[in-house]
Every structure is written in structure tokens, then in C-alpha cells.
Design a protein with these regions (language model features):
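Carbohydrate-recognition loop of C-type lectin domains
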Residues: 1-103
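An aromatic-glycine-centered, glycine-rich loop/turn in mixed alpha/beta architecture
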Residues: 84-154
């Protein structure tokens, strides 16, 4: 992270003996080439790495996904207000997941993020399955849809 102030997270692994893979993450849509260069220059210095190691710096892979939930609200709840609140909660969820490399998108966590006091039930429509994100990937939410499908007395 000290190589460039834009770096928010980093993954370091050794995919093969004698090789070090460094994957820096920034808040930018694409990791700028200057960040890759800065990390390479800092980590490839002979006083930093063993002489036999090869340093590879790579941009992270973006794993796009969309969030869609169907919610049933308790009677008396205002659909527009609650839709906005749930959308905001899902935006926070997506932002938190985007901030680190390798954070999985788990359907039960999506449902939990929607559990406001006015929500009776949540069905996660998308993603259709849990998304397992590798340490060299970051999850990137491309859209959020909240459908109010009904009301219940509880």
C-alpha cells in the first residue's frame, strides 16, 4: 500500500515457486497503469525481494454482478420509502464488498442487508447463487433492483 496512495487493498501470493504475484486494488474502475508500475518498482528493488524471486504485478480481475431482491413488507409500510431504504442498504453492502479483494457475495448476507424493521420477507433473485471471489478479484455491483411484491400482517 505504501507504493501508491491510491491502493486500498493488496493481495500477495506465490502461484509458483520463485514467483511473487502482487495484485493492488484501487477505488478506480480500472487499476491505473501508474499504480502497477509503482508497485513493481517498489517491490522489485533488490533490497526488498530475494534475488531468486520474480515479481509480477497485475491488476485485479473485476467480477461483475447485479443485485435483485423481492421483498414483502409489513402492512402499513410505505413501499416507495422502504424501497429507497433497502436500496440504500444494498448500496452500502456492495460498497463494502468492493473495498477489498476476495470478498464473496453470499445470498444470505444480501437478505440480511435487507432486513429492516418494515420487511416481512426477502427473496434474493440475483445473483442466482453465491459468488466466490478469488484473492485476485473484486466484486463489482452493476445494478440494484428492489421489487416490493406484497404486504403481510405478519
Amino acid at each position: 500500500k505504501s507504493a501508491n496512495a491510491m491502493i486500498t487493498d493488496v493481495s500477495v501470493s506465490s502461484p509458483v515457486p520463485g514467483s511473487v504475484l502482487i495484485v493492488p486494488l484501487t477505488n478506480e474502475e480500472e487499476t491505473p497503469a501508474q499504480v502497477i508500475t509503482d508497485v513493481y518498482n517498489v517491490c522489485n528493488a533488490e533490497n526488498v525481494r530475494p534475488l531468486t524471486d520474480t515479481v509480477i504485478v497485475s491488476a485485479p480481475e473485476r467480477e461483475d454482478y447485479a443485485l435483485m431482491v423481492d421483498v414483502v413488507l409489513y402492512d402499513g409500510a410505505d413501499a416507495a420509502t422502504e424501497r429507497a431504504s433497502i436500496t440504500s442498504a444494498l448500496e452500502d453492502f456492495a460498497k463494502e464488498k468492493r473495498a477489498k479483494l476476495g470478498l464473496d457475495i453470499i445470498r444470505s448476507h444480501i437478505a440480511q442487508a435487507c432486513r429492516l424493521s418494515s420487511v416481512y420477507d426477502v427473496t434474493v433473485v440475483a445473483p442466482a447463487a453465491n459468488l466466490i471471489i478469488s484473492d485476485e478479484q473484486f466484486p463489482n455491483c452493476t445494478g440494484i433492483t428492489v421489487n416490493v411484491t406484497g404486504f403481510s400482517r405478519g
